[in-house]
Amino acid sequence: MTTSPVKVLIHGASGRMGKALLRLAAEDDALHVVGAVVGRSPSQRVVDGVPYFAANELGGAPAFDVAIDFSLPQGFAPILALCVQRGKPLVSGTTGLDEAQRAGLLQAAGQIPLVWASNFSLGVAVLTELVERAAGSLPGWDCDIIEAHHVHKQDAPSGTALTLGEAATGSGAQPRFASVRAGDIVGEHSVQFTGLGERVELIHRATNRDIFARGALHAAKRLLGKPPGSYRVRDLVL
């Protein structure tokens, strides 16, 4: 018995992550991209067999099983609303969301399964757990989170740095942040715990953006069939 491919809608398809998602999804027989949503009216309506839609045409997107969103904060509310309206899961890696948008996520989680994360790599999922353990085991130590990304990344600190900070804070640390924007750095995060005469440093370096796209695609598959709720990446990939 063959299983039909999962129908995926990619929102934010013109960005770095969107392009990686399209390329990797095309290599996966278990996935079928039914639509790609971009900010402005596309110059081509169909590219490599994938229909393209402008953001203001989102309501006319074809039927899908799960949506994956890597866009900008101003484009987040419409894709969240569409998933709620159609009762479909959402995987989102859009960073820079404000408090109202985060509240909207929590409200939507009562109706659909969703996962929002600043980083979908397996390594960062493990790093987050290690930060929690280190912060709880090293009370009173200084905690510093240093992140570095390419010059075009707008938000700082990065969403991943903030997520790591939340993990540290939840275990009693008081993290400080520093950001670097330089060249074409894909993503580097260092969490340092410094005490008297010693320092613990936890580091994750991404050398290829594909790790994030693969993680998001894997999370999308795992989210199918889940009851409504807000899931963590580690719940789906570890």
Curated annotation (Swiss-Prot):
Signal peptide: none
Gene3D superfamilies linked to this entry: Dihydrodipicolinate Reductase, domain 2, NAD(P)-binding Rossmann-like Domain
Reactions accelerated catalytically: (S)-2,3,4,5-tetrahydrodipicolinate + NAD(+) + H2O = (2S,4S)-4-hydroxy-2,3,4,5-tetrahydrodipicolinate + NADH + H(+); (S)-2,3,4,5-tetrahydrodipicolinate + NADP(+) + H2O = (2S,4S)-4-hydroxy-2,3,4,5-tetrahydrodipicolinate + NADPH + H(+)
Subcellular location(s) of the protein: Cytoplasm
Active site: H149, K153
Pathway: Amino-acid biosynthesis; L-lysine biosynthesis via DAP pathway; (S)-tetrahydrodipicolinate from L-aspartate: step 4/4
Name by which UniProt lists this protein: 4-hydroxy-tetrahydrodipicolinate reductase
Organism of this sequence: Xanthomonas campestris pv. campestris (strain ATCC 33913 / DSM 3586 / NCPPB 528 / LMG 568 / P 25)
Source lineage: Bacteria, Pseudomonadati, Pseudomonadota, Gammaproteobacteria, Lysobacterales
